[in-house]
Amino acid sequence: MKCPFCGGVENKVMDSRVSRDGNAIRRRRECLACGRRFTTYEYIEEMLPTVVKKDGRREPFDRNKIRMGIRKACEKRPISTETIESLVTEVERFCQDYSGEEIRSSMIGEKIMKLLKELDGVAYVRFASVYRQFRDVNDFLEELKEFKQLHDLKKEKEP
């Protein structure tokens, strides 16, 4: 495993444990060249679908692309790395239902928005603003209005 800090390839595993959802092994590693520590996750390789983009291009499913989008939306929010990894795993599992087939990128985007909406309103709106390509403030306000209505309905149903 290559060190993300110095590029060294010699490291030792300091700690290994199964993730909360049981689908990955989390390892803390220490680089033998620079002494810094970093975390890696080990997953079972599964057949994942080809993603069909809006413009018709096809590309392989990329877990890291999902992670980066969710991480960017959750930036400076009280959301742990483990929670983000759990969301990424949930999206990946959703896509595994289309294993060997194709899945539209819009289905993946909608799944991420649904998960973020349940987790954190600010992260949801951030993701939606990029995913839905808001053109101006009115688009943004319309999305906020819909989110607030759903949020208010949930509050009314709580005992």
Curated annotation (Swiss-Prot):
Residues 49-139 form the ATP-cone domain. Pfam families: ATP-cone, Zn_ribbon_NrdR. InterPro entries: ATP-cone_dom, NrdR-like_N, RNR_NrdR-like. The keyword Nucleus does not apply. Keywords: ATP-binding, DNA-binding, Metal-binding, Nucleotide-binding, Repressor, Transcription, Transcription regulation, Zinc, Zinc-finger. Signal peptide: none annotated. GO terms for molecular function: ATP binding; DNA binding; zinc ion binding. PANTHER family: TRANSCRIPTIONAL REPRESSOR NRDR. NCBIfam families: transcriptional regulator NrdR. This is Transcriptional repressor NrdR. It comes from Syntrophus aciditrophicus (strain SB). The lineage of its organism: Bacteria, Pseudomonadati, Thermodesulfobacteriota, Syntrophia, Syntrophales.
